[in-house]
From Swiss-Prot:
Keywords: ATP-binding, Ligase, Magnesium, Manganese, Metal-binding, Nucleotide-binding, Purine biosynthesis. Its EC number is 6.3.4.13. One of its GO terms (molecular function) is metal ion binding. The keyword Transferase does not apply. It comes from the Bacteria. InterPro entries: ATP-grasp, ATP_grasp_subdomain_1, PreATP-grasp_dom_sf, PRibGlycinamid_synth_ATP-grasp, PRibGlycinamide_synth, PRibGlycinamide_synth_C-dom, PRibGlycinamide_synth_C_sf, PRibGlycinamide_synth_N. It holds the Pfam family GARS_N. ATP binds at residues 133-194. Its cofactor is Mg(2+); Mn(2+). Pathway: Purine metabolism; IMP biosynthesis via de novo pathway; N(1)-(5-phospho-D-ribosyl)glycinamide from 5-phospho-alpha-D-ribose 1-diphosphate: step 2/2. This is Phosphoribosylamine--glycine ligase. Gene3D superfamilies: 3.40.50.20, ATP-grasp fold, A domain, ATP-grasp fold, B domain, Phosphoribosylglycinamide synthetase, C-terminal domain.
Amino acid sequence: MKVMVVGSGGREHALAWKLARSPKVQVVYVAPGNGGTALDKRLQNVPITDPEVLAAFAEREGVHFTVVGPEAPLAAGIVDLFRAKGLRIFGPTRAAAQLESSKDFAKAFMQRHGIPTAKYQTFGNAAEAHAYVDREGAPIVIKADGLAAGKGVVVAMTLEEAHGAIDMMLADNRLGDAGARVVIEEFLAGEEASFIVVCDGKDVVAMATSQDHKRLLDGDAGPNTGGMGAYSPAPVVTPTLHARVLREIILPTIRGMEKDGIPYTGFLYAGLMIDADGTPKTLEFNCRMGDPETQPIMARMKTDLFDVLDRAIDGKLDGMELDWDRRTALGVVMAAYNYPDTPRKGDVITGIPKETEDSVTFHAGTTLKDGALTTSGGRVLCVVGLADTVKAAQRAAYGAVEQIQFDGAQYRKDIGHRAIRR
């Protein structure tokens, strides 16, 4: 069968890589793909981003189903468009994707359905937002209401930072429409974890747990990024906590969406904060797999992803269980010079090691032109190592990272430090 993955990042490369391993899959189209998907003989890049043209392509080629990687096409309604044409697609509708595309929608939804989260208020007026922050004090969290490519959250440790974030979003309009309203919430302390499930509208199956590293620099210093590395499983999510998250957060979300007349089909990612007592609260929802969490999760997944998504699209996930490699997978992101500001493009990449049983490299910001692989975006590669312990997986990943060269490459040297400390 033919399947299609929409997107061009490391997450999409990992999804396409996993789908291509299914005996039922003849070809995986990746639209538009990247340099890594271009190099893989089992994958075929399709230089299309327009949803209407993609739908026509899927129809013409007899694509069995399409899976959407990034948030922007989901928020723009690609699922609604494909479904209206009778095409099978995995992802939430535009209305359901508001769980990610509007922070205010998500917070109001959680409050309405009793899902644990931080207290908050939403503002469109800078003066009112400044007054609220002065009343509440710091630390405090300022979030752009709309999609801001992972750059719309400021964890302000001082009042000065909080006021600066409000001005940046509401007064200076630096995030455009995404920052036309801000959600201001209480600061939650603890350890973060990513909890991702596959939903079919009624039932869910949980993906392996994971934990990512948002900050640019070692020791969780420097600015926030889209993510500099991740590992799976996340030891902070114990079996007891896993059951609690499903019971208190995931299932009430799926039931709540159904109750509100917006049934949720697709990947659902709950960003969690686990406090010192082991109590989970929801920081955010994403309507897709995380990046870079997808890369280590796919490296560990033993179940055929084609079967999982095929059943989810048909609403038949009930009773399905997933099988996982017992090893830890740890992914290190290699980013371009000057990321996360204005990353440099066009640096030649060499030395990417061949895939082995214990390491695989997923591409993100790469382009293949005239046989040369060059950088084309902020996060360039995610190098995944697999081993029996976090420490050994870390060694496997960094062993591969050290073989790869491109000018200005930057990466953290401590991915997995929280798990190793435990």
